[in-house]
């Protein structure tokens, strides 16, 4: 299937060896991923390459691949069809209230605002993230990548004229190489300089480790004991909407 989002865990497969192979062939390589994936690549390569360009995406955390598979199975059961494509940032309801859409074989589609989707509720409430995400060593700035990109949530507070609900990206440059990349594409973009702490507050989940959900241990125990997706989802419980509002404002 096609999973169009930073909400799912990506499968790196043989990406690191392939990157090294292309670099040794003196080909230019652009590697994008989470900050921890880029740190892993740098650790694997053990040396700097002038022809390697790295861009990390702002990251809230990465959910369990197992719960993602369980979620897909639930969707397949409900619709009686296989999943062809999933999007977690669809703008059919606007950027701030983005929707989750799933295309099934047979032309069926599931489409709800993110705050109504069970998988997204578990993700945003920090219930189903990887253990390392609760003590992330890679969210500090500056990062080992050349650039960081992501959604500029809350931009309307800083630059009201940009609050059109169509989506604004934030770009952070960490190296001379990153600066050159931005300069080369600048004429194709509408850009504006901004204060870092205003567009990406230090309290944002993309700059600090997220807090563990109070029911996390119960959830893990249930996952290990083979509890159903619906039972596991029940551990989200209270204060979700409050958490979701904070997620939109400060991710």
Locate predicted features.
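Short cysteine clusters
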Residues: 7, 36, 133-136
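Short, flexible loop segments at boundaries between secondary-structure elements
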Residues: 50-74, 202
């Amino acid at each position: 299937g096609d999973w169009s989002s930073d909400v799912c865990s990506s499968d790196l497969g043989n990406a690191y060896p392939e990157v090294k192979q292309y670099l040794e062939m003196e080909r230019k390589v652009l590697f994008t991923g989470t900050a921890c994936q880029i740190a892993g690549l740098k650790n694997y390569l053990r040396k700097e390459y002038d022809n390697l360009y790295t861009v990390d995406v702002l990251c809230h955390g990465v959910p369990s691949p197992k719960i993602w598979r369980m979620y897909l199975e639930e969707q397949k059961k409900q619709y009686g069809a296989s999943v062809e494509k999933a999007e977690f940032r669809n703008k059919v309801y606007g950027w701030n209230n983005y929707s989750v859409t799933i295309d099934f074989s047979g032309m069926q589609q599931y489409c709800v605002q993110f705050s109504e989707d069970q998988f997204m509720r578990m993700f945003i409430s920090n219930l189903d993230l990887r253990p390392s995400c609760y003590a992330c060593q890679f969210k500090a700035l500056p990062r080992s990548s050349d650039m960081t990109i992501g959604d500029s949530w809350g931009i309307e507070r800083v630059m009201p004229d940009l609050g059109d609900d169509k989506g604004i990206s934030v770009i952070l440059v960490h190296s001379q190489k990153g600066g050159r990349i931005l300069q080369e594409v600048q004429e194709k973009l509408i850009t504006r300089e901004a204060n870092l702490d205003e567009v990406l507050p230090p309290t944002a989940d993309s700059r600090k480790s997220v807090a563990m959900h109070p029911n996390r241990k119960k959830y893990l125990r249930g996952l290990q004991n083979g509890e159903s997706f619906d039972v596991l989802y029940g551990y989200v419980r209270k204060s979700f909407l409050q958490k979701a509002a904070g997620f939109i404002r400060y991710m």
